[in-house]
């Protein structure tokens, strides 16, 4: 469910915190995807058009989620997006009341759905079908099996997938959380992406936590209080309190305990919810856990064709596409570097910003059951032209305080001209990215001192990739529309070659 009414409230109160982007903009990113939310969407969207029933195999087992997973993963990989699917485990005890209410509503919806079908009321049946769906353990198991056969990372949450997704982002193992549940923000997920797994052609909605905090003038602790008061899965709501009232109360009292007691609620219950948001139970993972694995064509064929009655021709085409994606080489996408200035801690003061959670902030299980394996990635190219890139440079010696800004066209050091020449080769190549492959360009220059590059790309973002090892040398900042400074790798006092495989413009 997430936080009740949060998105409409933010759309009105802090519209700058919410933006739309296309799937292509996420090329090269790694997404921690809430698997249960994704499977739920697939199961609702892919149904028999006559009776709105889920697609099934010869054993009567649902396969709608498998169709959806295949199609969406294929699209994500096509754009060079690395999906990391995160699966729920046993929910916390705090959520039992919410789950009981959902179970009751689902049973009521099933009764109404059957009645609508028997009466031939397809319009009502279509509206009700989403409320009857439950993602089962068997569906989760079959989804995990498919993903592993595709070489896609599978992460097991200790409890809530949303908390585990936020953990992966705060540990910099993934760049964004993809979920429909807004409580990922309350768990500390830096960016929330919605509609990533939607089957419809919806624009992806990005919610920026830092902009939310800035716009509401909350520190992270106050934001958690506000969201709990709006309504969450872990405690009851206070009568007559929605987002607008919750906002006013937090502004006035700045204490969850004071607010709850003022409204006649049970503070112990609210405190438990807050403690869980601030210190959820998660499994600990490392970089190997989120690496892409190898594709198993034989295993996929057996699972999809023999076990689930998919068309052999369809499966062969699907595997062919996966292998094609694998043979392409990824250029590390940089939306995360361009847009994600990670905070350092959960703040008590507004100036400190929201939290980038460390391991200590979570109740961590250090022995999760699944780990990742080898990585493969795909190319992503932009067709925007590279004209107008301006380059300035600074030179530094080992004393970083001794920095000389090179501003003139001609200069005693000669550094400006050599670096400008390096980028000038790209200025007029407006069709550079229309071809699949191109020769990397390089410029040899004297490295008597260490160089730093600073690019001004105006309304565009740029990234430079080192030809030799695909190391990101520098990236632009999409908010300030300025590049961060990227240091040239070669050691000072040597002559070296600075190779670029690509300049990406976003």
UniProtKB/Swiss-Prot annotation:
Chain intervals for the UniProt region annotation (N-domain): 1-106
Annotated region (I-domain), positions in chain: 124-253
Pfam families cross-referenced by the UniProt entry: XPG_I (PF00867), XPG_N (PF00752)
Question: Where are the compositionally biased (Basic and acidic residues) regions?
Answer: 348-363
Q: S-adenosyl-L-methionine: present as a keyword of the record? A: no
Annotated CDD domains: H3TH_FEN1-Euk (cd09907), PIN_FEN1 (cd09867)
Q: Which residues does the annotated region (Disordered) include? A: 338-388
Q: What does this protein do?
A: Structure-specific nuclease with 5'-flap endonuclease and 5'-3' exonuclease activities involved in DNA replication and repair. During DNA replication, cleaves the 5'-overhanging flap structure that is generated by displacement synthesis when DNA polymerase encounters the 5'-end of a downstream Okazaki fragment. It enters the flap from the 5'-end and then tracks to cleave the flap base, leaving a nick for ligation. Also involved in the long patch base excision repair (LP-BER) pathway, by cleaving within the apurinic/apyrimidinic (AP) site-terminated flap.
Q: Does the keyword DNA damage apply?
A: yes
Q: Which cofactors does the annotated protein need, by name?
A: Mg(2+)
Which controlled-vocabulary keywords does the entry list?
A: DNA damage, DNA repair, DNA replication, Endonuclease, Exonuclease, Hydrolase, Magnesium, Metal-binding, Mitochondrion, Nuclease, Nucleus, Phosphoprotein
Which InterPro entries does this chain map to? Answer: 5-3_exonuclease, 5-3_exonuclease_C_sf, Flap_endonuc, HhH2, PIN-like_dom_sf, XPG-I_dom, XPG/Rad2, XPG_DNA_repair_N
Q: Which SUPFAM superfamilies match?
A: 5' to 3' exonuclease, C-terminal subdomain (SSF47807), PIN domain-like (SSF88723)
Tell me which residues bind Mg(2+) 2: 181, 183, 233
List the residue ranges of the region (Interaction with PCNA). 330-338
Query: What does this protein's record comment on cofactor binding?
Result: Binds 2 magnesium ions per subunit. They probably participate in the reaction catalyzed by the enzyme. May bind an additional third magnesium ion after substrate binding.
Q: Name one GO cellular component term.
A: nucleoplasm
Q: Where in the cell is it found?
A: Nucleus, Nucleolus; Nucleus, Nucleoplasm; Mitochondrion
User: What name does the UniProt record give this protein?
Assistant: Flap endonuclease 1
């Amino acid at each position: 469910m997430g936080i009740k009414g949060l998105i409409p409230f933010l759309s009105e109160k802090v519209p700058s915190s919410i933006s739309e982007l296309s799937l292509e903009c996420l090329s090269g990113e790694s997404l921690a995807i809430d698997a249960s939310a994704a499977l739920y969407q697939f199961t609702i969207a892919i149904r028999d058009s006559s009776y709105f029933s889920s697609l099934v195999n010869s054993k009567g087992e649902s396969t709608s989620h498998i169709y959806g997973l295949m199609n969406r993963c294929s699209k994500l990989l096509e754009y060079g997006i690395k999906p990391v699917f995160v699966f729920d485990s046993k929910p916390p005890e705090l959520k039992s009341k919410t789950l009981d209410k959902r179970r009751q509503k689902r049973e009521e919806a099933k009764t109404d759905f059957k009645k609508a079908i028997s009466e031939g009321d397809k319009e009502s049946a279509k509206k009700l079908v989403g409320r009857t769906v439950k993602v089962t353990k068997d569906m989760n198991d079959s989804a995990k099996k498919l993903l592993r056969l595709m070489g896609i990372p599978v992460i097991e949450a200790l409890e809530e997938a949303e908390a585990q997704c936020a953990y992966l982002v705060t540990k910099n193992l993934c760049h964004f959380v993809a979920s429909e549940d807004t409580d990922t923000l309350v768990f500390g997920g830096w960016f929330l992406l919605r509609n990533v797994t939607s089957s419809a052609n919806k624009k992806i909605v990005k919610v920026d936590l830092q902009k939310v905090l800035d716009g509401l003038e909350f520190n992270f602790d106050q934001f958690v209080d506000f969201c709990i008061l709006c309504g969450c899965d872990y405690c009851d709501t206070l009568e007559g309190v929605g987002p607008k009232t919750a906002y006013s109360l937090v502004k006035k009292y700045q204490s969850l305990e004071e607010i709850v007691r003022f409204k006649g609620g049970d503070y112990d219950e609210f405190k438990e919810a807050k403690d869980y948001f601030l210190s959820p139970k998660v499994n600990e993972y490392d970089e190997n856990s989120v690496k892409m694995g190898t594709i198993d064509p034989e295993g996929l064929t057996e699972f999809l064709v023999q076990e689930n009655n998919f068309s052999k021709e369809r499966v062969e085409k699907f595997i062919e596409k996966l292998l094609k994606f694998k043979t392409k080489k990824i250029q590390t996408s940089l939306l995360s570097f361009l847009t994600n200035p990670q905070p350092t801690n959960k703040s008590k003061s507004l100036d400190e910003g929201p939290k980038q959670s460390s391991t200590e902030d979570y109740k961590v299980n250090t022995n999760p059951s699944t780990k990742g394996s080898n990585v493969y990635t795909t190319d992503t190219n932009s067709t925007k032209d590279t004209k107008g890139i301006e380059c300035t440079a600074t030179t530094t010696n080992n004393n970083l305080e001794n920095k000389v800004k090179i501003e003139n066209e001609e200069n005693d050091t000669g550094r400006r001209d050599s670096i400008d020449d390096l980028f000038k080769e790209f200025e007029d190549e407006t069709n550079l990215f229309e071809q699949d492959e191109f020769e990397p360009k390089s410029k040899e220059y004297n490295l008597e001192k260490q160089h730093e590059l600073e690019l001004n790309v105006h309304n565009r973002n740029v990234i430079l990739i080192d030809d030799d090892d695909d190391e990101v040398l520098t990236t632009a900042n999409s908010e300030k529309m300025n590049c961060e400074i990227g240091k040239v790798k070669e050691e000072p006092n040597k002559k070296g070659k600075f190779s670029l495989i690509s300049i990406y413009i976003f």
